[in-house]
Amino acid sequence: EEFVDSPFSAETTKMLYSRGYLTDKNIDEELNYVQHLAHLFHQRDKKLFKSFAFLVAYNCNFRCPYCFETNISQDGRHWSKRVFSKELVDKAYEAMLLIEPQKELHNKIITLYGGEPLLKENREIIDYILKRGKSLGYKFDAITNGYDLQAYMDVLTPGLIEALQITVDGCKERHDERRTHYVMGKSFDKIIENIGMALQRGIKVMVRVNTDANNFADLHYLGQLFEQLGYSSLPNFKMYSALLRGDNNDVTSQKLKYIGAKKFHDLHKKEKFRYNCQDYGTLNKIEATIRTKKIFELHSIYCGAQSGSAIFDPYGDFYSCYQTVGDKKHIIGHYGKGILKYSDASKHWYEHNISVSHKCSHCKYGLLCGGGCLAKADYNIESGFGKSFCNDYPSVFAIAVNKAYDVLVTNKQFL
């Protein structure tokens, strides 16, 4: 009765109404409904899987100009040298059950992180972390620069460290200029060799290319190199391009030329998306929606940092976001004394969703995007997050829809 003047047939009008394209709600009612859904989705996510990581040490053997952990050096070299003790490893595993008592809700893959987790001098404590974790039913992956991998080849195996993310920043010359070993200097050749050895061990290797305007063309070079080496034909190898964000006025980043998200995706579009690029999982969700004919997966948060995940550091503190580790105002809590003590920051992180952001709650992409990365949003330790960080999701979504059409419709994979 509300849509008697509809230009569509009764059947089409009913379908549009059932899907929410037509509504009998006014603007305020729609916004209230979105906020209600945002809270429901957030509560759902907080009750689901928790992910955990060990920040083995803040120390790193590389000196990269764009590293977000550069500010950690302000605490002095000695501060970053501390490595996990066996006692703290035990307490971290105990803390995981305090954070989420239902072990079946634990992500069974624990991430090893840093700094650089797989420094050769960290081998003893890595062995202890792996041994304790395996006895408790966990497996591992690692985010590593890949330089010291030869010291870990025997534990790069199914059941222990099963996957690696390794950064390669373009051709040899450019990579060596950006990702410099603090003693040996050049690192490209050794990393490429180590990637090959890791692949031979049967584990997954994801090569990440931190991409700006200066090295975008190097994606083609790397693609050819990995084909020539036989890496690309292996099912356990992937390479993807990740947008490098930063300020071009930063004097520490003179070797870099940052670009925005729209420019980044426009460049990939010109290359007909020959290389995988960062799209926050949007393409996979669209393809899954079409294939399964189920509703698109909606979220009111950007990632697990807002739903209770924890990154344990060697000082007895834990964080929720990889990009805020070492920044004391983002400490979520403390676990080092055998009990969990949450900080005020935990409320800011774990209670933030799109409903508390005027911009995000009014955006039609809000429940698809989840509100953008909080690590890049305005933040105050007392009041929490202010203006949200928009990652140009509308253009990301439009590109993903077109890619899904090309893959599923043109190739008739949806049938």
Regions found by a protein language model. Name each.
Residues E1-T12, Y21, Y315, S355-L415:
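Radical SAM enzyme core and accessory elements
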Residues E173, E177-Q306, K328:
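Radical SAM enzyme [4Fe-4S]-AdoMet core and its adjacent flexible, acidic
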Residues V56-R63, Q306, C360-H362, G366-L368:
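Cysteine-centered iron-sulfur cluster-binding motifs in ferredoxin-type domains/subunits
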Residues W79-V83, E177-G185, N380:
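Short glycine-enriched, charge-decorated loop/helix-capping segments at active-site entrances
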Residues Y17-D28:
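A short, conserved structural fragment
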Residues K257-K293, Y322-G370:
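C-terminal accessory region of radical SAM enzymes
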Residues E29-V155, G159-E162:
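Conserved alpha-helical substructure of the radical SAM core
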